[in-house]
């Protein structure tokens, strides 16, 4: 997939973090889509791309599924620590 050419949007606060975590774990977007499906989130490649680019809002159930698929806590995904 080619790199994003437009600047990120401002519709959500987790898109950039999802990309960074996914890339740190060496998970391709296609593989991440499959992983999301295994945790119960059926999302299209376009929708995931828009989420990662911060061009769409994120639903609460999507946050839960993304955290589960990345094997991290919701707090870590949101950038918050438990004692903040």
Which stretches of residues belong to each language-model region?
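Residue-level detection of the helix-turn-helix DNA-binding "recognition helix"
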Residues: 19, 23, 37-38, 53, ...
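Alpha-helical residues within the helix-turn-helix
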Residues: 23, 34, 68
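Short alpha-helical DNA-recognition segment
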Residues: 26-50
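Short, basic-rich loop-to-helix N-cap that marks the start of a DNA-contacting helix
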Residues: 55-65
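Short amphipathic alpha-helical segment with a characteristic S/N-K-E followed by hydrophobic residues
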Residues: 57-58, 70, 77
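Short amphipathic recognition helices of helix-turn-helix/homeodomain-type DNA-binding modules
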Residues: 65, 76-84
């Amino acid at each position: 997939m080619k790199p994003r050419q437009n600047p990120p949007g401002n519709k959500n606060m987790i898109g950039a973090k999802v990309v960074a975590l996914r890339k740190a774990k060496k998970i391709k977007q296609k593989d991440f889509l499959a992983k999301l499906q295994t945790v119960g989130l059926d999302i299209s490649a376009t929708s995931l791309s828009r989420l990662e680019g911060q061009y769409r809002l994120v639903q609460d159930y999507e946050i839960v599924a993304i955290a589960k698929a990345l094997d991290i806590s919701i707090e870590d995904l949101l950038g918050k620590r438990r004692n903040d």
